[in-house]
Amino acid sequence: MMSFRGHLTPGRRFDIPTTVISPAISPAPRDAWEVVLRSDPNALESQSPAWTDAACATGSFEDASRLYETVDGRLLVLPMLRRRHTVGALAVEASNPPGWGVGGLLAPGGPTTAEVATVFSELAGRRVLTQRLWPNPLAAESWAEGAPDNAKGTERVAHLIDLQGGFDHVWSKLFEKSSRRGARHAEREGVTVECDTTGRLIPEFYRLHSQAVSRWSRLQHEPEWMAMRRHHRNDPREKFEAIARCLGERCQVWVARIDRKPIASMIVLQGNNAYDFRAAMDDDYTSYRANDLLLRLAVCDACRAGCRFYYMGDSGHSVTLARFKERFGARPYDYAEYLLERLPISTVERGLKQAVKRAIRFREAGLIG
């Protein structure tokens, strides 16, 4: 374990829960953070120090992670990013911000309800404008029971594939027949797949992702310029390049091609668990079933790497998207995102967004890609 001076301390125990914690150290020392990350079986790479490095490399955030130690030596880490140029009582912090995936508390064996409640209490006492917490869906029960009454909760639904039993079990018992058939169809049609961990394939992924945003804008009755402006602000190419650079081999970029033309791509973060972080496809080539083949290969690789779960992200209220994920054996997990704020900023933001949507006659679309 790690003392608050940032050095490994032998002989300390990780497995004794308590609701007594020391004052937080921020930013969290990286060696302690890495130890806690690897000892939490539900951890995702979006909770890693490398992920924070990637977010900070974009120039939009600063590391505001927090390290706690219990009276019995158990370490807890809360990854946290602070929006640049917001400080003190005007600070805007999140674990993690929108567009940056799952955050939330890390602990050896996973956080307990008592630990979540204690950290919530510590956060609530800080003079910070807003603190947004997007926890791991696998820890939903601890967060639901530990959240205070003044934490605003937003219901979410995530889909995860349980990889226990290995790929043969997942393929034969969890993948539906239509998905297995789709993967074989893609191979017969000549779809080829490449996986890279150097960032070399980011440009191909990003072109497909940008095309998908343009397509979504038409389906959702949103002006294309508005959708693309938001896309380049929230998901610039430099963001994905930073992720690939900072995570290295833990960031896989998969690209499916037909006659050398990229037709589908996804970014998978691989650690204790696999995280299907982003995916996009060329809608003109859906008949090739490239997504089915990509998912077969990515899930197989996650099983081979020893991942316990394959996280397919949130599904929102889209029945179509949920059904797509369930074809590959994913199951829904209900959980909540939490917000601590000193002023009703979220209420104002939500009202403005709804007003814009009404003005452009925006309609939700259940989309894949």
Residue ranges: model-predicted function:
Residues 41, 127, 209-217, 302, ...:
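A generic secondary-structure signal for well-formed alpha-helical elements
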Residues 66-67, 108, 117-121, 237-350:
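Aromatic (often tryptophan-rich) hydrophobic motifs at membrane interfaces
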Residues 82-102:
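Conserved acyl-donor/pantetheine-binding loop and adjacent beta-alpha core of acyl/acetyltransferases
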Residues 96-106, 153-160:
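Acyl/amide activation-and-transfer machinery of modular secondary-metabolite enzymes
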Residues 132, 194-195, 308-313:
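Short catalytic-loop micro-motif centered on adjacent basic/acidic residues
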